């Protein structure tokens, strides 16, 4: 929440990411958008284009790594559910799936950390999300199912994006978050 920081000159922009052009921001923060675009790489290029020289960019996307179960089971459901009326999707599709996910995550969170459990699908993510209540799980599952497009991105794709000549190579970072997503960024030249 930026209102709780000393920064006084900030703006939240909501626009078509791929076509939006600005004079450049000190920070462009793009979370959960790129992986839903028809062309995620074009979206990333737009992020970079909207950072002023010396400014920073930070992005977060779904990883291909660590999401095998989601890709195998949830993606086929999403392709159908995303075409349904949102209330049907939210309450008749997402809610039952969220209930299963809720209990699975809570079970993994209660398990004593052990090498065997760490091999369960989405172990790290489940231990993180298990701290939340059911409504958060429901929101996450619905968010996963409502979008018409999702692309799970490999680390190598992110590495290639960060080779953009407009980004200082010494400033880049890629971190796996919760075993199933990438957070990454750098400083514009």
Q: Which ranges hold each PLM region?
A:
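Short alpha-helix adjacent to the SAM-binding motif of class I
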Residues: 1-5
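Conserved SAM-binding strand-loop segment of SAM-dependent methyltransferases
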Residues: 6-18
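A short acidic, Gly/Pro-enriched loop at the edge of an enzyme's catalytic core
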Residues: 18-28
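A short SAM/SAH-binding and catalytic strip from SAM-dependent methyltransferases
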Residues: 26-40
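A short glycine-rich, Lys/Arg-flanked "PGG" loop and its adjoining helix->strand segment in the class I
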Residues: 41-56
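Conserved class I S-adenosyl-L-methionine
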Residues: 56-99, 117
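SAM-dependent methyltransferase
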Residues: 84-148
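C-terminal lobe and adjacent flexible extensions of AdoMet/dcAdoMet transferase-like proteins
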Residues: 125-189
């Amino acid at each position: 929440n930026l209102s709780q920081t000393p920064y006084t000159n900030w703006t939240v922009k909501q626009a078509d990411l791929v076509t939006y052009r600005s004079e450049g921001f000190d920070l462009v923060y793009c979370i959960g958008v790129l992986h839903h675009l028809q062309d995620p790489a074009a979206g990333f290029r737009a992020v970079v284009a909207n950072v002023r020289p010396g400014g920073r960019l930070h992005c977060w996307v779904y990883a291909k790594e660590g999401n095998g179960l989601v890709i195998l089971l949830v993606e086929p459901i999403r392709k159908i559910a995303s075409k349904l009326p949102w209330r049907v999707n939210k309450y008749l599709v997402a809610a039952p799936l969220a209930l299963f996910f809720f209990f699975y995550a809570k079970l993994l969170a209660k398990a004593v950390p052990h090498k065997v459990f760490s091999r369960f699908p989405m172990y790290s993510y489940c231990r993180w999300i298990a701290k939340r209540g059911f409504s958060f799980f429901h929101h996450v599952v619905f968010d996963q199912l409502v979008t018409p497009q999702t692309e799970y991105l490999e680390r190598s794709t992110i590495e290639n994006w960060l080779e953009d000549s407009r980004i200082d190579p010494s400033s880049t970072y890629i971190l796996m978050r919760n075993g199933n997503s990438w957070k990454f960024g750098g400083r514009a030249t």
